Amino acid sequence: MKIIDCTTYYSEDLMLDVRFNILNDYVSKFIVVESKYSHSGKIKPLNFNINNFPKFKDKIQYMVIENEPQGIIPNNDNSASIKRMNSLLRIEQSYNFILNGLHDVSDNDLICLSDNDEIPNFESKDFKNSKNDIFIFKQLFFYYKFNLFYDLIPWYGTK
């Protein structure tokens, strides 16, 4: 069984480096997807540089989304609800795009999908002997920064 870790990227090198270091002993491959568009639809430069992660270079598969998703709604009135809907379409596109990197997986491989700051704890579960097909990780909730730990609610992140 292989574990493939899939995430999207904007410009969070520090968080991605933390993620790679924590998961490296468990993961066979890291899939990193970056879009040429921000969630708000603005064209942005590509920020990912594989040379910033030399220790993990052989495990990283980097993929770029070149185009906007289908179904973007023109927003001439600057409507907040249309902005949100279009943002969700872009997020959905980035998660779906990860499928393009999963051509060499088998039925018993574990594919994990989460944002960079949602880092699963693989020490806590014996995946090889589990009968479950889907796992949802209960994770620690840090509110955007490591010094902002919030312990009043559980965070169910990586799936």
Regions found by a protein language model. Name each.
Residues 1-25:
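N-proximal low-complexity "stem/linker" segments adjacent to membrane-targeting elements
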Residues 3, 23-38, 56-61:
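Short loop->beta transition adjacent to catalytic acidic/histidine clusters or analogous donor-positioning motifs
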Residues 5-11, 33-34, 113-116, 137-140:
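Short His-Asn-centered micro-motif
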Residues 30, 62-64, 134-136:
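Conserved beta-strand scaffold positions in the cores of enzyme catalytic domains, especially
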Residues 11-13, 38, 68-70, 142-143:
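Surface-exposed, flexible loop/turn segments at secondary-structure boundaries
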Residues 118-159:
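Conserved catalytic core of nucleotide-sugar-dependent glycosyltransferases
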Residues 27, 57, 108, 131-132:
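Short, well-ordered alpha-helix to beta-strand connector turns
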Residues 37-113, 122-123:
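Active-site-proximal specificity loops/subdomain of glycosyltransferases
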